Amino acid sequence: MSEAPRAETFVFLDLEATGLPSVEPEIAELSLFAVHRSSLENPEHDESGALVLPRVLDKLTLCMCPERPFTAKASEITGLSSEGLARCRKAGFDGAVVRTLQAFLSRQAGPICLVAHNGFDYDFPLLCAELRRLGARLPRDTVCLDTLPALRGLDRAHSHGTRARGRQGYSLGSLFHRYFRAEPSAAHSAEGDVHTLLLIFLHRAAELLAWADEQARGWAHIEPMYLPPDDPSLEA
């Protein structure tokens, strides 16, 4: 059971980066949608009854030019490249990005819960590594929810141990198609993936809010994906 306080704001997060953890990637695109708990507890629908994004939400999307090169696969999937970002004169993940991120989070009612799909294995450790490189921190009471193990856990509970759910895919695209019988738009752009993630969350909002209250992990327990070369922790 989580000992963290009940989150007031949920900040849905997605990162696009230069590659997988094995290449010690850098962030190239960052998108966050901040939604108050009350909007998740009372999802909105259009005239046809379809789920829509909350009318009140804050958005932040930034592109940045990493120092490390993109792997060919990462560039193919994301549509981003070092050349394209440099041509648009985008700086890297620097102090200005940190200040913008901190200002964005400071406008939200706390405590904050960061939400990402596969967040514990990718988004959170990578963001932690980039922040640590710059000596930056997030608010002390920030917690994290990874919707990938959360949805798997919820489905296991509903299936009472049967294997039927386990054979289904849990990528964002698979979940979106299963819940909405449609394909997500703008897949593998940070903002497009956050839009998809938020709709998936809204589809099972009551269950995921309860899961977050019980299972959210404190940001202080997130380990960086890798340490910068000059990090004191690397000194024996």
Swiss-Prot record:
Detected in heart, breast, prostate, skeletal muscle, testis, uterus, bone marrow, colon, small intestine, stomach and thymus. Its EC number is 3.1.11.2. The keyword Hydrolase applies. It comes from Homo sapiens. It comes from the Eukaryota. Binds 2 Mg(2+) per subunit. The second magnesium ion interacts with only one residue. Substitution with Mn(2+) results in partial activity. One of its GO terms (cellular component) is cytoplasm. CDD domains: TREX1_2 (cd06136). This is Three prime repair exonuclease 2. Homodimer. Keywords: DNA damage, DNA repair, Exonuclease, Hydrolase, Magnesium, Metal-binding, Nuclease, Nucleus. The active site is at H188. The lineage of its organism: Eukaryota, Metazoa, Chordata, Craniata, Vertebrata. InterPro entries: Exonuclease_RNaseT/DNA_pol3 (IPR013520), RNaseH-like_sf (IPR012337), RNaseH_sf (IPR036397), TREX1/2 (IPR040393). One of its GO terms (molecular function) is molecular adaptor activity. Exonuclease with a preference for double-stranded DNA with mismatched 3' termini. May play a role in DNA repair. Its cofactor is Mg(2+). Substrate binds at E16, A17, Y122, D193. Mg(2+) 2 binds at D14. It catalyses: Exonucleolytic cleavage in the 3'- to 5'-direction to yield nucleoside 5'-phosphates. Its main location: nucleus. Changing R165A: Strongly reduces DNA-binding. Belongs to the exonuclease superfamily. TREX family. Changing E16A: Loss of enzyme activity. Almost abolishes enzyme activity. GO terms for biological process: DNA catabolic process; DNA metabolic process; DNA repair. Optimum pH is 7.5-8.0.
